[in-house]
Amino acid sequence: MKLWGGRFNKGSSSLLEQFNASIGFDNRMYAEDIAGSIAHSKMLNKIGILTVEEQEKIENGLIQIKEMIDNGNFEFHISDEDIHMAVEKKLIELIGSLGGKLHTGRSRNDQVALDIRMYLKKEILNIKDLLKLLMEAIVEVAESNKDVIMPGYTHLQRAQPILFSHHMMAYYEMMKRDLDRLEDCFKRVDVMPLGAGALAGTTYPLDRNLTAELLG
């Protein structure tokens, strides 16, 4: 966190900046941040803010940054504060002041909301795939132990004899409910947040539908 204002006589303590910096954990969202910026640049080109040449230069710079991070050749610094600033700073280093033009019609709040939603969408799908694999394994175990009898417990005491396969399928049903919850969660995060700006929108004629379409 930095002090964005003119009423302060000096900058914030370095300890405060280190404590508030999110770059240490939000750097995992670099792919989402870059994808969002590429889509935003294409939208800015469509509405006439960026020329074709400018958009291509920005996109190529962002692709280069992603490749650097993918290959472990990108160094993150606490002074960058967050992934958005780190990417923007490197972009300006690569292509000059044009990199700052990418921020037109978009605030940090926009980027945070978008990156988190895109990251969650990806992780929800990953978790669903892993959960389905686990459910398949449970079914296999249940089918191969159809005749195995085990004690069923209630109140920590043995109560009735049950089939081990039924016991395993109980976990299958629990995970099936979890899949339903994940699908509902996906619907809730699959919403386009861009366009609000810092608070109540912007005077630029942003095409939110195009950006949403580009991002899937």
For the regions a protein language model found, what residue spans apply to each?
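A helix-coil-helix interface module used to build multimeric assemblies
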Residues: M1-G201, P205-L214
